[in-house]
Design a protein with these regions (language model features):
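Single conserved hydrophobic/aromatic residue that forms the stacking wall/gate
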Residues: 1-14
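Short, Lys/Arg-enriched, Trp-marked, Pro/Gly-tolerant hinge/linker segments that flank
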Residues: 15-34, 57, 70-78, 82
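Basic, amphipathic alpha-helical hairpins
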Residues: 17-24, 36-48, 68-72, 89-98, ...
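Append "Primarily bacterial transcriptional regulators
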Residues: 52-59, 64, 68, 102-109, ...
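Terminal helix-turn-helix DNA-binding modules in bacterial transcription factors
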Residues: 70-109, 131-134
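…primarily DNA-binding HTH/wHTH and HhH modules…
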Residues: 116-134
């Protein structure tokens, strides 16, 4: 989680248009790029998993897992978590939404799990983070 935590904290993006977070340099295969695009478009879906991602781009779960990890140093689901927390930070900083609303907006059904994941990656609870943005 330390690697994810530092990446979430940096808030660097590859492309603002898609809000893709910074990844290790180097060319990415079409499967990795398609996975990043899929995550950017569907991160709010609480049912997203490696199976739905792999099916959407037409490859096996095993191949997707291998290629994504090799090219990014993250698992696809690890990146999904990272992306969700990145988007949650943006929503919490806006201050228009309550923590439970943000949790649902970024794909978490369980607010407590969202809170513990957020704190693990940012060092602050969602409400502490939001208070600092006011």
């Amino acid at each position: 989680y330390e690697m994810l935590r530092s990446l979430v904290g940096s808030e660097m993006c590859i492309r603002d248009r898609d809000d893709l977070l910074a990844l290790p340099k180097g060319d990415k295969s079409k499967y990795v790029l398609q996975t990043l695009e899929y995550i950017a478009a569907h991160y709010a879906d609480a049912d997203i998993n490696i199976t739905t991602i792999a099916r959407s781009i037409g490859i096996s779960e095993g191949h997707l897992s291998h290629v994504f990890k090799k090219e990014t140093s993250y698992t696809a689901l690890g990146y999904l978590t990272l992306y969700r927390i990145h988007m949650a930070r943006r929503l919490l900083a806006d201050c228009r939404y309550k923590v439970y609303e943000v949790a649902g907006m970024v794909g978490y059904r369980d607010v407590a799990y969202f809170g513990s994941t957020f704190k693990k990656l940012t060092g602050l609870s969602p409400s502490e983070y939001q208070d600092r943005c006011r």
